[in-house]
Regions:
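PDZ-domain C-terminal substructure recognizer with occasional recognition of PDZ-binding tails
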Residues: 132-175
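PDZ/PDZ-like peptide-tail recognition elements
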Residues: 32-95, 168-170, 184
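Active-site scaffold of zinc-dependent metalloenzymes
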Residues: 82-100, 115-118, 174-207
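Conserved PDZ fold ligand-binding element
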Residues: 105-133
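Catalytic Zn2+-binding segment of zinc metalloproteases
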Residues: 201-202, 209-211, 218-234, 264
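Short helix/loop segments within enzyme catalytic domains
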Residues: 32-61, 159-162, 238-287
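Pan-zinc metallopeptidase signature
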Residues: 281-310
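Bacterial N-terminal signal peptides
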Residues: 12-24
Length: 310
């Protein structure tokens, strides 16, 4: 899948926040806060991405603390609905939309609806919400939280149902490759050197095994350092030559290994490639090996897979 410059993905990431609740205008029409359930595209991407990162620590050259949090803030929304969102969700700091089961956040007792107001006893500095919806505030908070976790546990000051409490988030490392859900009616995915992203259409169409390979393939591009130059797409038209094709082979091999280590079946990779080949047949050959060759290589990699191997 194509490597996109980081700023391009970050400009689009805010949409994943609104997708988690439905469109903001729909969300505020409800009588009670709406949170994504476990089978929503948002939580599936977050959960599968967490498992891939957590279960492949030994295969990644660079690690960072994982939280298992799906977050939002007022800056994530259009200015026209921010007041309603603040009232409906009690949102003044950084809000918790979802928590990945079994994650550090889940073990800390964090819940959807919690509003994070402080770190280690110090209030979070507010980020001025801009004239348009933006992911900047969440990205800044996530980076700050990860940096603090690098030094050990972090005490979070949280408002829950109008009452303050303190929860302790422990450091739990995994691959330094974050995941994101982007809008899009076409099944597609990208990586930009930091994020592995899939479209809403892909997340809705793919089963867990297929989505595990799609995210694993994109995370592999991040882990292998492929963002230095553009390379071909798993689903779309690529622009590279022989070197790009080799990088796609590398990402397939590492991606299926990562997905197997996280508990997803190799058959999902085959189904995904078949499906995407039918949807994007005109562009795959520019940077990708043939689908049959890719599936054969994936089967070979899966046959040699050992959970303990690095």
């Amino acid at each position: 899948m194509p490597v996109r410059e980081s700023f391009t993905l970050r400009k689009r990431l805010y949409v994943a926040i609104s997708l988690a609740l439905g469109q903001p205008s729909v969300a505020v029409a409800q009588d009670a806060p709406q949170f994504p359930d476990a089978r929503s595209p948002q939580m599936r991407v977050a959960t599968i991405g967490y498992r891939l990162a957590a279960m492949n620590r030994q295969r990644c050259p660079r690690l960072e603390p994982l939280t298992g949090l799906l977050l939002h803030d007022l800056g994530s929304y259009d200015p026209a609905v921010r007041q309603q969102i603040a009232s409906r969700y009690g949102l003044a700091g950084v809000g918790v939309l979802g928590v990945v089961p079994g994650s550090a956040a889940a073990d800390a007792g964090l819940r959807p609806g919690d509003d994070i107001r402080g770190l280690d006893g110090k209030p979070i500095a507010p980020v001025n919400a801009g004239p348009t919806a933006s992911y900047d505030g969440i990205a800044l908070f996530t980076d700050m939280l990860v940096q603090r976790l690098m030094h050990g546990e972090v005490a979070l000051t949280v408002m829950r149902a109008g009452e303050p409490l303190t929860v302790t988030l422990l450091r739990r490392d995994g691959c330094a490759a974050r995941v994101a859900l982007l809008p899009g009616r076409k099944p597609d995915a990208w990586s930009d050197g930091r994020y592995a992203a899939v479209t809403q259409a892909l997340a809705e169409a793919a089963g867990d095994d297929e989505l595990g390979f799609a995210l694993g393939h994109e995370m592999a591009h991040v882990v292998l350092g492929h963002a230095a130059e553009p390379h071909g797409a798993l689903t779309g038209i690529g622009i590279g030559g022989k070197r790009s094709r080799e990088r796609e082979r590398e990402a397939d091999r590492r991606g299926v290994t990562m997905s197997l280590a996280a508990g997803y079946r190799e058959a999902g990779a085959e189904r995904l490639l078949d499906r995407l080949a039918n949807a994007h047949a005109s562009g795959l050959s520019l940077t990708h090996p043939s689908v049959r060759a890719r599936i054969a290589a994936i089967r070979e990699t899966a046959a040699a897979f050992s959970p303990e191997a690095r």
